[in-house]
From Swiss-Prot:
Cytochrome c oxidase subunit which plays a role in assembly of respiratory supercomplexes. InterPro entries: Hypoxia_induced_domain (IPR007667), RCF1 (IPR050355). The lineage of its organism: Eukaryota, Fungi, Dikarya, Ascomycota, Saccharomycotina. This is Respiratory supercomplex factor 1, mitochondrial. Associates with the respiratory chain complex III/complex IV supercomplex.
Amino acid sequence: MDIIQKMVFKSKQQPLVPIGALATTGAIILASKSIRRGDRIKTQIYFRYRIGFQLLTLVALVAGGLYYQTETAQQKQTREEKLRDKAKLREKLWIEELERRDAVIQERKKRLEESKAELLEVAQQGFEEARETETREAQLKKEEIEEKEN
């Protein structure tokens, strides 16, 4: 809220205060004009008006402050409901974020398990091929030895 919006908002909340301020300003302007003209009686009257308008403005300001200081039960309930709704929304967003993170973690675990299984399979194939090669080599050596003996 910028300053103009804030002034308009406060003026709508307490409409007697700006009216009293304008009336006080008007009384001061009229008093200054009567001073220039040299009319002492009118000057005194306008200054008395100024004091009266200032008093009314001050009373309106204090009364409005007291009125708006004590929230009505409905306003308080509405404010609390807004805060509750905001908290629920935050909680919902947080839960969604946690679920998203959990899904990412589960996907990573799944890929890791698949990768491990694939590596184990490749390693098993390599071991089997190595055994077969060793078995063939052993058979070839055995055959060579048998041929030499014959």
